[in-house]
């Protein structure tokens, strides 16, 4: 994996080019496509091809794909080809950023992997065995990331010490396993909200021989899912800034999870390069269409459109005026509300199409703003949306959500 910084600004973050293996050059800040079990949620490859024709990177998760390891070990093509996207690169994470990860289950030599089949305790040896079966283009090192803003100093220190032990094995095996010889390892930086612990984690990574890893992944700030949308910038940003000052500029930095648009912009300004679409997914499964504006104007805008709201049942206009996505071009708010009322599968499909299109457009504007050194202007606009007060981008669980047990049935009530 090759990463080149094109421009850098104190107030606007940095623009870069990322090339994974022999793929096309990817522009950073980069948005990874979050997947569930190897598939982009609700969308077939053909439908996703109508959302975008641009080169993408799939963010796959071991906790939703571990059952595929045996067959993948016999697969002689790329991981992207296995999941139906042969032209896309792949990045493998341990945990699903869309779902809150249960706490506990950590031990001296194991990390819990929560799957649909229950909990599996992963040793570093077992983890590398699974990763080598997948042979992704990029993967994260094994880490204890079970920390959040409420974690005690003792829990934080244990997460750092365990991660160091796991990574000693990962660095060694990464160099020796044949199926990982073309893969890039991301070094995890853990330590909760403790600057001393974060410094210790960074120091351990930087002590490794040059070329041992190709980038950083920041873990341990949250436990994924909707709680990540409620992170406090005043707590998070000083820790991230502290970390960024201690790591090499020439390596890319990844921050997974459903972070709010405002927090993403703040992190980009600090120098984080890679994010994912889990926020768009979390909004969709809670019946919310993204409607915040990133094209500066003088009108007031809201963060979401709640398609369960009875007030839109006779609104025969797009979910977002002026949106060019397939859903908004062909369907109305009233129709999407009708799909929710009748539990039709097309409902979440249309929401996912719209939210992904909107979020990818948001990142296009982010890159343009950085190029013009105007990210601060975009940040102020997205934060207020011409409203008297800051807009709330936190995603609260809807009383009616898409039930996991019957995802193929479309919208269903929690009671079902």
UniProtKB/Swiss-Prot annotation:
SUPFAM superfamilies: tRNA-guanine transglycosylase (SSF51713). Keywords: Cytoplasm, Metal-binding, tRNA processing, Zinc. InterPro entries: QTRTD1, Queuine_tRNA-ribosyltrfase, TGT-like_sf, tRNA_ribo_trans-like. Pfam families: TGT. It comes from the Eukaryota. Zn(2+) binds at residues 323, 325, 328, 354. It is found in: Cytoplasm. Its cofactor is Zn(2+). One of its GO terms (biological process) is tRNA-guanine transglycosylation. One of its GO terms (molecular function) is metal ion binding. Binds 1 zinc ion per subunit. One of its GO terms (cellular component) is cytoplasm. Heterodimer of a catalytic subunit and an accessory subunit. HAMAP family: QTRT2. Belongs to the queuine tRNA-ribosyltransferase family. QTRT2 subfamily. Non-catalytic subunit of the queuine tRNA-ribosyltransferase (TGT) that catalyzes the base-exchange of a guanine (G) residue with queuine (Q) at position 34 (anticodon wobble position) in tRNAs with GU(N) anticodons (tRNA-Asp, -Asn, -His and -Tyr), resulting in the hypermodified nucleoside queuosine (7-(((4,5-cis-dihydroxy-2-cyclopenten-1-yl)amino)methyl)-7-deazaguanosine). This is Queuine tRNA-ribosyltransferase accessory subunit 2. It comes from Drosophila mojavensis.
């Amino acid at each position: 994996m090759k990463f080149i910084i094109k421009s850098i600004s104190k107030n606007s973050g940095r623009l870069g080019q990322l090339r994974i293996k022999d793929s096309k050059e990817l522009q950073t800040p980069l948005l990874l496509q979050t997947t569930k079990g190897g598939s982009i949620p609700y969308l077939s490859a053909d439908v996703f091809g109508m959302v975008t024709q641009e080169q993408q990177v799939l963010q796959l998760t071991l906790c939703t794909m571990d059952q595929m390891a045996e067959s993948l070990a016999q697969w002689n093509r790329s991981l992207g080809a296995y999941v139906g996207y042969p032209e896309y690169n792949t990045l493998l994470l341990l945990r699903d950023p869309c779902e809150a990860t249960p706490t506990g289950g950590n031990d001296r030599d194991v990390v819990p992997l929560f799957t649909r089949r229950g909990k599996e305790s992963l040793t570093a040896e077992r983890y590398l065995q699974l990763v080598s079966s997948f042979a992704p283009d990029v993967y994260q090192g094994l880490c204890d990331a079970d920390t959040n803003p409420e974690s005690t100093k003792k829990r934080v220190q244990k997460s750092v010490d365990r991660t160091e032990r796991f990574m000693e094995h990962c660095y060694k095996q990464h160099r020796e396993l044949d199926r990982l010889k073309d893969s890039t390892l991301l070094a995890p930086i853990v330590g909760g909200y403790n600057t001393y612990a974060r410094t210790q984690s960074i120091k351990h990574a930087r002590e490794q021989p040059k070329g041992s890893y190709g980038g950083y992944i920041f873990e341990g700030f949250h436990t994924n899912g909707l709680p990540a949308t409620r992170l406090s910038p005043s707590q998070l940003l000083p820790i991230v800034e502290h970390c960024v000052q201690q790591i090499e500029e020439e390596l890319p930095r990844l921050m997974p999870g459903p972070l709010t648009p405002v927090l993403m912009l703040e992190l980009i300004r600090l120098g984080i390069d890679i994010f994912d679409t889990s926020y768009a997914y979390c909004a969709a499964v809670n019946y919310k269409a993204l409607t915040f504006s990133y094209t500066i104007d003088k009108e007031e805008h809201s963060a979401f459109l709640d398609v369960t709201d009875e007030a839109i049942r006779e609104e025969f206009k797009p979910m977002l005026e002026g949106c060019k996505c397939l859903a908004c071009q062909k369907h109305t708010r009233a129709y999407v509300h009708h799909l929710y009322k009748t539990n039709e599968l097309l409902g979440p499909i249309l929401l996912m199409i719209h939210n992904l299109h909107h979020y990818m457009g948001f990142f296009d504007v982010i890159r343009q703003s950085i190029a013009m050194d105007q990210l601060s202007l975009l940040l102020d606009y997205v934060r207020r949306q011409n409203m008297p007060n800051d807009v709330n981008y936190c995603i609260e669980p809807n009383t009616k959500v898409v039930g996991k047990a019957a995802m193929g049935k479309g919208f269903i009530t929690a009671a079902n």
